[in-house]
Amino acid sequence: MIVFDSGEGQADPYVGAIVYDSFISELAHQFHGAMIVFEHRFYGGSLPNGLTLESGEDLYQYLTIEQALADVAALASNFSVKGIKSDLTSSATPWVFVGSSYSGLRAALLRERYPHAIYASMAGSAPVETKVDFYEYFKPIASNTPAKCRSVIEEVVNFVDAAFAGHNETLKAELKSEFSASNLSDFAFGESLQAPFQLFQNVGYASPFTDFCEYMTNQSQISWNMSSDRRLTERWASWPQQASLSAELTQSNAIDTIEARSYLVSDGLAKFLFLVSILH
């Protein structure tokens, strides 16, 4: 049994891609296994009786990591399918749990806490360790980004870093305006520039990160009436997806309630502006 955990979201959108076109389906075919797309409690249709938008607030006491982990162990220990005589429970059939990000953390915890139920786990991008200055995160992105695109990104990042490290408020205002981010704090603006790299995390170098690199390195469409770093920054700001991605990353005002200190770390893509936050 190979279980894919949809994490903090409904499972339906994942079913087609996971079952018919994924490395997980390849594993299932290779080992003659069956697949399950698991939906986390309190997401999608996996809601307790009585919970609505208007009522049932007391039920949220059952939305805990421990109880959500126990759901998986209970399923593995008692699973059966009508019409199949084989024992599919974890006592007779190996259960492999697959997840990434939060669900990757769940995969690691399940193997540790329920070894009798989970035979093996595949934990991708699992945040099992808390670290303030996690510059290593960007290393795979740097090493897998074409040299020309990486050079352009470095130039823009260095320029923006220098602008926000100084006291030229006019330049900072101009940059925020170009990125449709005039209402954002300096910290939130820095966060918004991570948008293309979030795309790399989600889908690898394939589109739309590929589109970003091609857009940034298309010299025929770059204005030449200003300095190199300035015109490349303007080019980044005009990338069609930047505004919407920035809005997604900063849709919550919570990011502006954070007191931040910035560090320039000479590693990964460039001296990227790493923001170390201290919650009030």
Residue ranges and their predicted role:
Residues K85-Y102, R106:
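Alpha/beta-hydrolase fold nucleophile elbow
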Residues V81-D87, Y119-A120:
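Substrate-binding/catalytic groove segments of enzymes
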Residues M1-A73, S77-K82, S101:
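N-terminal cap/lid subdomain of alpha/beta-hydrolase-fold enzymes
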